[in-house]
């Protein structure tokens, strides 16, 4: 993206972003499905303790719903940083940090009238924090950002030449 920004080619930046959203969506949904339907199998790769696997599976089966939210937010913020807009990342991640911390306190321990949910509460807090991140980043990108000029209409644009270049240049890195 930075090379296109240096050339002032915002059309190409928008095309690449659309491809990145598609790839991120596909991969995050794949990982979400794996974590949702096979949490025990995934955790058994890291631990043989049945108590750890059982507890971790409950958490993983919930927190996996944050993967797509996190992926989309990261694409937005990475693109903004590529064109020199870095302040929004600080706002997004600071807001998320404080929201997640507060929600963890409330949902894990059952404060402010909420039931104590333990690990499930931590997963729910994480999902809410990731939704907050995506909301703030989306409002900024689609409502206030003027350098790239990315709109909701651009999400549907598919440029085959950029898709081919993207696959050639990005696949080895992945």
Features from the language model and the residues they span:
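Alpha-helical transmembrane segments of multi-pass membrane transporters/permeases
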Residues: 24, 79-106, 123-127
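Interfacial helix-capping/hinge residues at the ends of transmembrane alpha-helices
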Residues: 39-40, 74-77, 104
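Hydrophobic alpha-helical transmembrane segments of polytopic membrane proteins
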Residues: 63-76
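Membrane-embedded alpha-helical transmembrane segments of multi-pass integral membrane proteins
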Residues: 73, 103, 133-136
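Short alpha-helical transmembrane segments in multi-pass integral membrane proteins
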Residues: 1-66, 114-171
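Glycan-recognition patch characteristic of GH18 chitinases/ENGases
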Residues: 110
């Amino acid at each position: 993206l930075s090379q296109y920004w240096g050339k002032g080619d915002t059309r190409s930046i928008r095309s690449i972003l659309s491809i990145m959203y598609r790839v991120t969506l596909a991969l995050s949904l794949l990982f979400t499905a794996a974590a949702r339907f096979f949490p025990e199998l995934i955790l058994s790769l890291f631990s043989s303790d049945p108590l750890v696997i059982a507890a971790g599976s409950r958490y993983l089966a919930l927190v996996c719903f944050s993967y797509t939210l996190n992926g989309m937010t990261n694409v937005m913020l990475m693109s903004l940083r590529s064109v020199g807009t870095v302040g929004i990342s600080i706002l997004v991640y600071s807001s998320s940090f404080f929201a997640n911390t507060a929600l963890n306190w409330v949902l894990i321990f059952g404060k402010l009238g909420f039931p104590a949910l333990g690990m499930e509460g931590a997963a729910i807090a994480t999902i809410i924090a990731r939704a907050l991140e995506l909301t703030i980043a989306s409002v900024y990108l689609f409502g206030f950002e003027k350098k790239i000029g990315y709109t909701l209409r651009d999400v549907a644009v598919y440029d085959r030449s950029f898709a081919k270049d993207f696959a050639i240049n990005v696949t080895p890195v992945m």
